[in-house]
């Protein structure tokens, strides 16, 4: 039986807001069942630090009694409104409480929404002991350049 754990609570917001500019109930902007609703989303508003973290709790699912087919799926895009830093990388980690279970860094975000995923190894999936305490952490990492490069 296929199960889907979807965002159902905010754990920490960092400097992230939703499409309306609010940092309240961010999970509601990324909890779509179809995954293709790009009209609501979350975005980091922090351009002064090297990284910004948001974490959401996931809905409870039962232990599948198998370590196969544990897949984290998300939809994302990147932008560089300043024109100086390039498109940031996005690290997504699956956590059980404060313990990291699996993580993947995406350094190739596109400027249009696209689907991304990573599959847990058997050992990562077997490390999950409480399927009612799963979370997703999103860390946006910006590379700062002190001066833009200009040809002379």
Q: What is the predicted role of each segment?
A:
Residues 125-139:
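Noncatalytic modules at the cell exterior or secretory-pathway interfaces
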Residues 52-54, 68, 86-90:
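Short beta-strand/loop motifs in extracellular/secreted proteins, especially
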